[in-house]
Regions:
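Active-site/substrate-binding loop(s) of hydrolase catalytic cores
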Residues: 1-56, 63
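Sec-exported extracytoplasmic/periplasmic mature domains
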Residues: 26-29, 70, 135, 139
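Active-site-adjacent mobile loop/cap segments within catalytic or ligand-binding domains
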Residues: 33, 42-55, 86-143
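Short catalytic/ligand-gating loop segments at beta-alpha or beta-beta junctions
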Residues: 37-38, 73-93
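Acidic, glycine-rich loop-and-strand cores that form catalytic or ligand-binding grooves
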Residues: 51-52, 56-77
């Protein structure tokens, strides 16, 4: 048990959550990946590091989602030094776009502030802002 715990996070797919996510991505075909995170109001679109084949499609879909929301659009940027530092490591979006060659996006929603009733109101406001984004994505695939 000590060996397993000391190695977690040091090798690709060493955490159970990561293994499960990789298995899902490998087993099921999809038309894209949307992930959600807290911190800002952004839609980040990812591109293949080896080529630009899916970049125009990713940009077009991201632009469509941006028009449906009040979120800022960002292209995933990775400097050369960061690529070397994190070689072999990556985000679910990077893994998905590299293996499936389909668009991937991270949607950053505002972080919750305060305690009590304010938190519930914040959650409801964020939900109102983003609840249609997955549907907008699906409907824009064939356009």
């Amino acid at each position: 048990v000590h060996y397993i715990r000391s190695r977690m996070g040091e090798e690709p797919a060493s955490e159970n959550e990561t293994k499960a996510l990789i298995r899902i991505i490998q087993e099921y075909d999809g038309r894209g990946l949307l992930t959600f995170a807290q911190s800002g109001r952004e839609i980040i679109y990812y591109h293949c590091q080896q080529g630009v084949g899916s970049l125009p499609k990713s940009y077009r879909l991201a632009r469509h989602m941006q028009k449906s929301s009040s979120y800022h659009l960002e292209r995933e940027q990775m400097t050369e030094s960061a690529r070397e530092k994190f070689k072999g490591m990556g985000t679910p979006e990077q893994y998905y776009i590299q293996t499936k060659k389909q668009p991937a996006f991270r949607i950053k929603v505002p972080a919750q502030s305060g305690n009590g009733r304010g938190v519930e109101e914040d959650k409801k406001a964020v939900y109102e802002e983003i609840h249609l984004l997955p549907l907008e994505y699906i409907f824009s695939l064939d356009n």
